[in-house]
């Protein structure tokens, strides 16, 4: 243990602790801007400057380790002025379009400037905006970039892709796509983790809300909404709603209040995905001599892009089942269009997703089979919240309402798609029933739950032994793929989600700088599953009706046409 003094307070902490963490133990706040624990501890912003007795230069609290007998002062005049000057210099390279910025009110630089009482910037503005393709799912405004290097570190250390790089020096330092490439030329997964970790508005998703507003005013369009499982665990955060107010039923009511007549739940098509994917897995497993194993889940487009670009020889292991988003779009424009006596082109399908890469997936021609785009627009959770705010809807005052039928009923198994391991667990519940003729205990496969990036389990179903792996975060995915390629591990079924923690921590979820709500959202989804009256995808009566009236059975010819795809052919 190390004993030191911080602002005249004695502090004892383990060896290797930083000044920043030591100060937290005695409730002394040291401001930060670029810092992300264990990810970005490079002291690029110098906002966390402190005095250390006996040392001439100010120290960065975020990466300076404590020493026995050290005396630290965090709020002297010298420290205060240095921090203020550092923030003023950062502001001089950051365009001040706060009123129209998507992060206004949720911007760490804005909050820091206010806290430091900065009312003017005494330095000449040097912010410059560089060209960027505004059709891409992820947009970058270089005039707002503060060179904190978070995007560089997150992409390199959490996602193992290294899409971003630092170039230049001094006042000319900037961040760009590695090698000066355009984003659509780089091996970017479009996961959006760089967006959700940016402290300002330099990175954001493409905003497609106006397309939805226009469709709602078009009398020739039947606007159909689908809401992903993970969205219900996060949508109220940006609106200031408590968890007991931010329910899935109030979410349905809020979307309906925008003028949407058909409000459905993607949990329905998550159940549909399970019926198709579990059937495909059983078929592959029982014909292992001619099938590619392990079978990889395919509902995460960030993961699909990663596998295609980094391990193309393994792309054939992907399940051919479309994601719940794309399955829903296909069913909405075929089965549901017939129920409404409408043409497929008259259905305008909007999906609300916790994900930025879903925008790419919806625009991929090979992922649609009924029209050019089975899903017309993808909104992130953040975009939905902005629409609700733009329409001045008092969400908290709305009564709860159910999702519409017949595409609005889902099982608890479908709900847990939104958390890492959920797809695997849901698939195993149904695979067990198909192989044995009876349901397992609903929580029989809970062993695969958790937040560890790479988890593995072995389960026995009758006389069958299944070797399984679950991964979230692309750094973990890379480790797993390397091990599979080197034949160091052997599995039958593998679930991969690009974002740490799964969709709950998706790149399109509400941003809380310095806080991670992923695990809390996941627990919320597990509780919804536990409380559900239907916990098996194959027992969803709406799914049973869909097969009886339209599809026939899983893996039927029509199911293959509408619900399956060859990801190896997807346009990247």
Residue ranges and their predicted role:
Residues 1-4:
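Short structural boundary motif marking the start of a folded domain
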Residues 9-15:
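A short N-terminal beta-strand-loop micro-motif at the entrance of redox/enzyme domains
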Residues 11, 133, 143, 186, ...:
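Residues that cap or flank secondary-structure elements
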Residues 46-190, 196, 203-218, 222:
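Fe-S ferredoxin-like electron-transfer domains
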């Amino acid at each position: 243990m190390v004993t030191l003094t911080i602002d005249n307070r004695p502090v004892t902490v383990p060896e290797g602790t930083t000044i920043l963490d030591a100060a937290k133990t005695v409730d002394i706040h040291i401001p930060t801007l670029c810092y992300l624990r264990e990810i970005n501890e490079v002291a690029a912003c110098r906002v966390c400057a402190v005095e250390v007795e006996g040392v001439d230069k100010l120290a960065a609290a975020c990466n300076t380790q404590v020493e026995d007998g050290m005396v630290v002062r965090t709020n002297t005049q010298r420290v205060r002025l240095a921090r203020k000057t550092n923030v003023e210099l950062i502001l001089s390279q950051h365009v001040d379009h706060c009123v129209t910025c998507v992060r206004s009110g949720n911007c760490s630089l804005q909050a820091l400037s206010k806290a430091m009482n900065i009312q003017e910037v005494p330095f000449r503005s040097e912010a410059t905006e560089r060209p960027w393709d505004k059709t891409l799912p992820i947009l970058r405004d270089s005039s707002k970039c503060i060179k904190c290097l978070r995007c560089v570190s997150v992409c390199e250390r959490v996602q193992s892709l290294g899409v971003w790089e630092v170039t230049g020096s001094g006042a000319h330092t900037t961040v760009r796509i590695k090698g000066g490439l355009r984003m659509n030329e780089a091996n970017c997964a479009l996961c959006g983790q760089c967006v959700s970790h940016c402290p300002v508005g330099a990175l954001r998703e493409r905003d497609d809300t106006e397309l939805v507003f226009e469709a709602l005013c078009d009398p020739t369009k039947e606007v159909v909404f689908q809401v992903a499982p993970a969205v219900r665990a996060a949508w109220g955060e940006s609106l200031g709603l408590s968890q007991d107010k931010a329910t899935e039923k109030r979410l349905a009511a809020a979307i309906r209040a925008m003028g949407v007549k058909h409000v459905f739940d993607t949990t329905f098509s998550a159940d549909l995905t399970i019926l198709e994917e579990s059937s495909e897995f059983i078929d592959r497993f029982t014909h292992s001599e001619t099938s590619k194993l392990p079978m990889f889940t395919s509902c995460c487009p960030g993961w699909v892009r990663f596998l295609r670009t980094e391990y193309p020889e393994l792309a054939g292991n992907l399940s051919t089942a479309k994601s719940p988003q794309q399955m829903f779009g296909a069913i909405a424009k075929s089965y549901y269009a017939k129920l409404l006596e409408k043409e497929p082109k008259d259905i305008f399908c909007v999906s609300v997703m916790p994900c930025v890469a879903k925008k790419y997936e919806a625009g991929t021609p090979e992922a649609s089979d009924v029209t050019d785009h089975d899903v017309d627009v993808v909104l992130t959770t953040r975009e939905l919240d902005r629409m609700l705010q733009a329409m001045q809807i008092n969400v908290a005052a709305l009564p709860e309402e159910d999702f519409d039928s017949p595409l609005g009923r889902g099982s608890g198994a479908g709900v847990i798609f939104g958390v890492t391991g959920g797809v695997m667990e849901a698939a195993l519940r149904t695979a067990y029933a198909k192989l044995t003729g009876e349901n397992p205990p609903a929580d029989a496969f809970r062993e695969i739950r958790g937040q560890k990036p790479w988890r593995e389990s072995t389960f026995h179903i009758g006389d069958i032994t299944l070797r399984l792996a679950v991964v979230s975060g692309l750094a973990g995915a890379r480790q797993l793929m390397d091990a599979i390629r080197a034949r160091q591990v052997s599995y039958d079924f593998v679930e991969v989600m690009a974002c740490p923690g799964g969709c709950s921590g998706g790149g399109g979820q509400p941003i809380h700088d310095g806080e991670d709500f992923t695990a809390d959202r996941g627990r919320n989804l597990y509780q919804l599953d536990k409380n559900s009256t239907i916990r098996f995808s194959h027992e969803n009566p709406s799914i049973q009706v869909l097969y009886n009236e339209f599809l026939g059975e899983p893996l039927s010819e029509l199911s293959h046409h509408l619900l399956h795809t060859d990801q190896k052919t997807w346009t990247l």
